[in-house]
Amino acid sequence: MGSLFAELARQAPTNAYREVEAYLREIPEFRSWETKPRARAETMEYSVWLRRRTIELSPDNSELTDDDLRYIAAIGEVRADAGMSSDSRQQVLQLHTRLMLRDIQEAAESLRGGEVEELMQVMTWFAPQGDRGIVAYRQGFVTVLRRRLPYVEQVALLARSLLTGDPMAADLAAALDWELPEFCAVTVIRVPDRPLGGHDLDIEIETLVKTHRVPAVWCPERGTRGGELIAVVPCADEAIRLPSAPDAVADLVGDFAEALGRPCAAGTATAPLDELPASLERARRISKSAPLGKPTRRVRPYTMADVFVELAVADVPVIDAWLHAVARSLEPGPDLVTTLDAYYCHDMNRGAAAASLNVHPRTLDYRLRRVAELTGIDPGSAHGIRTLSTVVTRRLSGAWT
């Protein structure tokens, strides 16, 4: 064994101790070790073992054995069984990798740049075998989650993993016997106010997940009764190029809105699987710009093509304030915002708009004239369409409440 490996072996207990201390310092869930010395000792033992196996196997680039991988998986099981969260699991893996690389760097620096061949050997070994170890650890972790968590909570964890780019998503999907698609539509259903009664929509979400077989998670809004249902709906690759939402998304949104019984708004954004974290932010912004709809199956998911003007306006306060002033000027009239909404939703077809409002076409005409009187803007003009349709959507989205 060369001098780099000898130095790593000499420093293994010290470096393992430093790793345990880093867990205590940087990961809050590990602070319970202060009262659980056995757990701390077991982690110390594992950290020393992993460093020694690195030193034993890397000189001739030998792989971790099946027994090694089973031991690593068992550590993942122990930590999951102790209640470690997925976020902490990810922190542990990142911190461990960073510290192992620091161990190697410090050992090489202590030799003043010598033993380059040994440094290349250990680094060549570390990347592929580190990946195998991480996979084994994740699989052990998921084994316990599958045993401990109810089905809907497993699905919610899969949704969160997909939306944060956590590699554990593949293991969770396999445990649920689901195949991860190449493309998805991230859908955010915004619910400003949950139904009365104090329940947390568990039944509605469980029904939705089992019916549509999609990962979904409820995210409550702090300090309110509202929140978001976020679903990851598989779609075909061509859906990314279409301006409308996939049919599967529309079906899911309609089912949830009907079961919810409260006004809600939905936004959706499509993306390849590895770009879901960014598409979540887009879908969330779209849902905040979309109008709140009545709780029926007719609630539809909005896309960027539907509300791109409103998205832009929301980022320009001076324009948003002007539109808000136009909206306030409509307040003296009879149901003018609702009337304009129907008028534009029916492509300015007077007969269809009047029928949807259950009024006579002449009543519709009167209301449109009243809009022009109050705002100085003709609803049927190009300027009126551009301005008043945006006013209506902003008002119905709840942006100005």
Predicted feature descriptions by range:
Residues Q129, L157, S161, D200, ...:
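Amphipathic alpha-helical interaction/coupling elements
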Residues R40, A159, A170-A173, D202, ...:
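Short amphipathic alpha-helical segments
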Residues M1-A156, P334, T338-T401:
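Alpha-helical/coil-rich non-catalytic "connector" segments in signaling and regulatory proteins
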Residues V116-T124, E204, A245-L252:
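Glycine-rich, flexible loop segments associated with nucleotide phosphate handling
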Residues L50, V92, F126, L201, ...:
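Hydrophobic alpha-helical membrane-association signature
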Residues L172, W178-E179, F183-C184, R194-G198, ...:
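Cytosolic nucleotide-utilizing catalytic cores of signal-transduction proteins
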Residues Q139-R190, T339, H360:
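Signal-transducing coiled-coil/dimerization helices and immediately adjacent hinge/linker segments
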